[in-house]
């Protein structure tokens, strides 16, 4: 391998930072420890990269996720060996399922101690292998620039994902006078494939004979930077669209062809479109079970086309008639260039529009309890649907998906595939650092809040003005809902008998606390959401709230419960 001489002796830790800076990294999220002391010593006087000191390694990884999801850049994490690395595993797994580009540096004991059960040693490479796109253990200091450059490239290209670098302490300490050539040399790695004209023409030909097509808009549209092209394609052919959770914002909720989120807690119009369609075009979605519910019953009478950058996703869940392995942006760009095929979906559009009107998301205002749906709807109005919205996981996540009026790309930052409680607050911190001029609002339940609330310490420490909307029902709401619906109301360990005083907790972190419990003054009280300072807005809601409508596990998209039809003569299941 070609060697490159350095101007002066340089430590492994300095090489890490210099390489990251050359790659354009501006922020690192981390937490120090023994095996990473050499790197943190180098960080002390290093200029050009800001280090954000998390309060827990899980917090650091979620902060990096929020930063990456909001900006499209690679999120960088630095944690120590052993418990530092294992604490980061949840965030790494979350990033893996949601295709988030992360570069995670984990400390490791010295090379001579590896495999000998040394203090704070863990087989981090083995632990993270199933939940990373690739991982490395650096054994030679001169190899640091090459591996860091390669890992960064792998994290952000193809299907994005987390890449882990295990960095033994001795390797980061040693000084070298020359390095291995860091130029990329990955002859067997294909960044992405591009669809052929023949494949795309087949997709369009099927569209020309279709009468009831629908597009599933997935997170891949966001990740590939394809939102504008996607919208142009939808407009050109006038195809109704259903969104996955991670696909919200790819087409504005207000658009006449947007049917809303599909799946377990999706809209009636979206789910019925999947049932009635004769042609399903999946763009950048995994056919996740939370979207299609019962894969065996999906598209029984429909032709399925699926464009995805990952060959493993094509045909994995749902039988696919037109599988297209391709970078989505390239495929959509070419679809717009090809000669337009003749289509007529007017009758179909009338049908899906009627379904939107027939059973919209709705709720009954109450005089004694605040409705969470109304809280979210009002915040949507006050922010004009333009805020960066972050959620934790649970009932509030689904209400926010249903009721916030999304209109922008990368607007919703949430944990999709893994459904990680504790994601919300740190992810919002990362999103605000990526988009400092945006109003960043995080919705969190009282369960998820108590998992990572220590990250609130960063708000005043770094001047991060996020708004935390705590939807407090004194329970693990989604768990309780399932117990009440499917386990004969046995609320086993899902109700909090004792909770902290959230006002005192907010004051301990030096942030404003507002408690809202009066539905009559809610509209005025929530105007505080537009203020530019960190705050905790605690909204008290009833323990009896359920997220509806819902497709019970294993049932089909047309077997929803809890629907409310505008026509009183329609059959309603309020189970």
UniProtKB/Swiss-Prot annotation:
Residues that, per the record, bind thiamine diphosphate: 57
Record-linked Gene3D superfamilies: 3.40.50.970, TPP-binding domain
MF terms (GO), sorted A to Z: acetolactate synthase activity; flavin adenine dinucleotide binding; magnesium ion binding; thiamine pyrophosphate binding
Cofactor: Mg(2+); thiamine diphosphate
Superkingdom of origin: Bacteria
Catalytic reaction(s) noted: 2 pyruvate + H(+) = (2S)-2-acetolactate + CO2
InterPro entries tied to this protein: Acetolactate_synth_lsu, AHAS_TPP, DHS-like_NAD/FAD-binding_dom, THDP-binding, Thiamin_PyroP_enz_cen_dom, Thiamin_PyroP_enz_TPP-bd_dom, TPP-bd_CS, TPP_enz
Enzyme class (EC, first level): transferase
EC number: 2.2.1.6
Keyword Transferase tagged: yes
Pathway this chain belongs to: Amino-acid biosynthesis; L-isoleucine biosynthesis; L-isoleucine from 2-oxobutanoate: step 1/4; Amino-acid biosynthesis; L-valine biosynthesis; L-valine from pyruvate: step 1/4
Details of cofactor binding: Binds 1 Mg(2+) ion per subunit.
Record-listed Mg(2+) binding positions: 446, 473
Entries under SUPFAM superfamilies matching the protein: DHS-like NAD/FAD-binding domain, Thiamin diphosphate-binding fold (THDP-binding)
Family stated for the protein in its record: Belongs to the TPP enzyme family.
Quaternary context: Dimer of large and small chains.
Other comment: Contains 1 molecule of FAD per monomer. The role of this cofactor is not clear considering that the reaction does not involve redox chemistry.
PANTHER family assigned: ACETOLACTATE SYNTHASE CATALYTIC SUBUNIT, MITOCHONDRIAL, THIAMINE PYROPHOSPHATE ENZYMES
Protein name from the UniProt record: Acetolactate synthase large subunit
Organism expressing this protein natively: Lactococcus lactis subsp. lactis (strain IL1403)
Upper lineage: Bacteria, Bacillati, Bacillota, Bacilli, Lactobacillales
């Amino acid at each position: 391998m070609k060697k490159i001489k350095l101007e002066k002796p340089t430590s492994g830790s300095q090489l890490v930072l210099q390489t990251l800076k050359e790659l354009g990294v501006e922020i690192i999220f981390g937490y120090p420890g023994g095996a990473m002391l050499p790197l943190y010593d180098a960080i002390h006087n290093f200029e050009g990269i800001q280090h954000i000191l998390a309060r827990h390694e899980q917090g650091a990884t979620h902060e990096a996720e929020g930063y990456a999801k909001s900006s499209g850049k690679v999120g960088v994490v630095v944690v120590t060996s052993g418990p530092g690395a294992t604490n980061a595993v949840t965030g790494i797994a979350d990033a893996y399922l949601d295709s988030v580009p992360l570069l995670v540096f984990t400390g490791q004991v010295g090379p001579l101690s590896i495999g000998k059960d040394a203090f704070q040693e863990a087989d981090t490479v083995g632990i993270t292998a199933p939940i990373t796109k690739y991982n490395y253990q650096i054994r030679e200091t001169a190899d640091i620039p090459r591996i860091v450059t390669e890992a960064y490239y792998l994290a952000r290209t193809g299907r994005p994902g987390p890449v882990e670098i295990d960095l033994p302490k001795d390797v980061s300490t040693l000084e070298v006078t020359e390095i291995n050539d860091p130029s990329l040399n990955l002859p067997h790695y294909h960044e992405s494939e591009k669809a052929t004209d023949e494949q795309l023409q087949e997709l369009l030909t099927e569209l020309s004979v279709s009468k009831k097509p629908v597009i599933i808009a997935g997170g891949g549209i966001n990740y590939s930077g394809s939102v504008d092209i996607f919208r142009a394609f939808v407009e050109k052919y006038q195809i109704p669209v259903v969104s996955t959770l991670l696909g919200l914002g790819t087409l504005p909720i207000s658009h006449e062809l947007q049917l809303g989120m599909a799946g377990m807690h999706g809209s009636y119009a979206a789910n019925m479109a999947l049932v009635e369609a004769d042609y399903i075009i999946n763009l950048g979605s995994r056919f996740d079970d939370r979207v299609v519910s019962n894969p065996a019953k999906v598209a029984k009478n429909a032709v399925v086309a699926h464009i995805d950058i990952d060959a493993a996703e094509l045909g994995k869940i749902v039988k696919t008639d037109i599988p297209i392995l391709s970078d989505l942006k390239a495929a959509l760009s070419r679809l717009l260039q090809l000669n337009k095929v003749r289509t007529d979906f007017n009758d179909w559009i009338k049908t899906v529009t009627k379904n939107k009107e027939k059973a919209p998301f709705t709720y009954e205002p109450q005089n004694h309890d605040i409705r969470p749906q109304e809280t979210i709807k009002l915040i949507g109005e006050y922010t004009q649907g333009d805020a960066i919205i972050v959620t934790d996981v649970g009932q509030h996540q689904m209400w926010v998906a249903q009721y916030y009026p999304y209109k922008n790309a990368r607007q919703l930052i949430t944990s999709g595939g893994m459904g990680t409680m504790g994601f919300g607050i740190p992810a919002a911190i990362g999103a605000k650092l990526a988009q400092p001029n945006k109003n960043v609002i995080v919705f969190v339940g009282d369960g998820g809040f108590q998992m990572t609330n220590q990250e609130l310490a960063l708000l005043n420490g770094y001047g991060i003005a996020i708004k935390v909307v705590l939807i407090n029902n004194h329970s693990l709401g989604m768990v309780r809902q399932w117990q009440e619906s499917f386990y004969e109301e046995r609320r086993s360990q899902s109700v909090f008998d004792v909770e902290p005083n959230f006002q005192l907790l907010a004051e301990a972190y030096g942030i404003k606390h507002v408690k809202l419990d009066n539905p009559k003054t809610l509209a005025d009280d929530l105007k505080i959401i537009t203020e530019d300072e960190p705050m905790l807005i605690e909204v008290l809601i009833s323990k009896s709230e359920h997220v509806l409508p819902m497709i019970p596990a294993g049932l089909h998209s047309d077997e929803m419960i809890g629907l409310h039809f505008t026509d009183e003569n329609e059959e309603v299941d309020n189970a």
